[in-house]
């Protein structure tokens, strides 16, 4: 997360509803040179930020209705992280397939899709207006499943 100052950090929740989960988080500042991969990943999703300080966000706890959940119980690593870069590269070489699937699943027309992330629950595509998320019909367990979903042989 790019942040200005910890005391000035605000999380904006556009719509509150009865099924919202409230989170208590902690920010831990880090040096962008020591953790360049994290900075690169953020920039792939969001573009070049202004002069900022960088922070990791840890979920301390959450509340959902009357339940309180420890943050560690919500943190999972991306099971596809070791092959994510290869999947993104292959999908970005097949923009027509990504464009068609994006429109079919979300109704959003993305003229120049750029896949920036893949996890078992879906695919993130950067568009000129923001990130479009395609939910996986069933959790992806392999790159082959992702390619089959996009009809890439």
What residue spans do the PLM features occupy?
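Binding-site signature for planar aromatic cofactors or substrates
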Residues: 1-153
């Amino acid at each position: 997360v790019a942040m200005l100052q910890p005391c000035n950090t605000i999380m904006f929740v556009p719509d509150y509803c009865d099924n919202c989960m409230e989170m208590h988080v902690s920010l831990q500042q880090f040096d962008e040179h020591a953790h360049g991969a994290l900075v690169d990943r953020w920039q792939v999703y969001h573009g070049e930020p202004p002069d900022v300080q960088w922070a990791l966000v840890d979920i301390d706890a959450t509340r959902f209705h009357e339940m309180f959940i420890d943050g560690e119980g919500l943190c999972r690593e991306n099971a596809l992280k070791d092959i994510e870069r290869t999947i993104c590269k292959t999908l970005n070489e097949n923009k027509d397939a990504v464009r068609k699937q994006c429109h079919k699943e979300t109704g959003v027309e993305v003229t120049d899709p750029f896949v920036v992330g893949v996890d078992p629950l879906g695919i993130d595509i950067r568009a000129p207006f923001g990130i479009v998320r395609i939910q996986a019909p069933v959790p992806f367990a392999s790159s082959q499943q992702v390619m089959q979903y996009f009809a890439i042989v």
